[in-house]
Amino acid sequence: MIRITIFGATGFIGTALTQHLMDEKYTVTAVTRTKNKAQKSLDERVRIFQWDYKNISKLAELLEQTDVIINLAGANIASKLWTKKHKQKILNSRINAGQKITKAIEKTKHKPQLLIQGSAIGYYGYDTKKKCTEKAPKGEGFLAYVTDEWEKSTEKIESHGLRRAIIRTGMVLGDSGGIFPKLIKPIQYFVGANLGHGEQGFSWIHLTDEIRAIEFIIKNHQLSGIFNLTAPNPVKSKVFNKTVAKALNRPVWLKIPAAILRLIPGNMGNEIFLANQWVIPSQLQANNFTFSFPNLSEAVNQLIKS
């Protein structure tokens, strides 16, 4: 029985991932600051490990009994305006978790076999212009900096012989939370709008495939390094809106000028709402991972019908 410890288990991806792994008969422990919140949102079979993100020795005791660590911990990127204070929280919440996981691993005698390190396609910058594989360099912007530091926060564990996989995730589409319900709501109420010219690249992945890809990495012991967790067919932003509108039988007739979106503090307009990212999951494809939802229309129709 593979023993998995998840940091960030109560988030949108973490909750669904935890449920899937439990259903597949893995032993799952969720690390959390607030036990009550975790108990309310997670399957009752999940072991809850309350940790204050300070006591390294206590965490090391848990990791002694762990085969796989999945680190998804970090403050929500798009939930609040990017004030200086919130940007610092976004950064610190990621770096602190990674560094403390690393210190705890260094204290263990019997080390885990694998660490899956969360990241995002923001690593490539907010205007990629061309398609990015895992070999593409780091781009510009706040999210590029954050994801780079997040990835670096656990890189030392490789010197201890652990397998490490970095998952650079795109826009995850699911009906239980995340960005999808927020994106479709304006279209449902006949106020759908294209953002800017609508030509921006939108690199997405269905939540089902996000979870399946993570399990794929766990099961295939030869896999390590960087993986783009995106569907193989990114689309233009306006095509995403058009696809949702068609599924809902609604029009998209409004347009929000880019100049207005760029007024949002902290460059959030450029990096979140106008991001132009064309990202390809080359490493998953090279290792014969099969997507359940490779095309946007299939993904959107499934989510709306569910």
Which residue stretches match the model-derived regions?
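N-terminal Rossmann NAD(P)H-binding glycine-rich loop of SDR-like oxidoreductase domains
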Residues: 4-24
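NAD(P)H-binding glycine-rich loop region in Rossmannoid oxidoreductase-like domains
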Residues: 43-97
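Conserved Rossmann-fold NAD(P)-dependent oxidoreductase catalytic core, especially the SDR/UDP-sugar
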Residues: 99-141
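Alpha-helical substrate-binding/gating segment
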Residues: 184-192, 200-234
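Mid/C-terminal beta-alpha module of Rossmann-like enzyme folds, strongest
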Residues: 220-267, 301-304
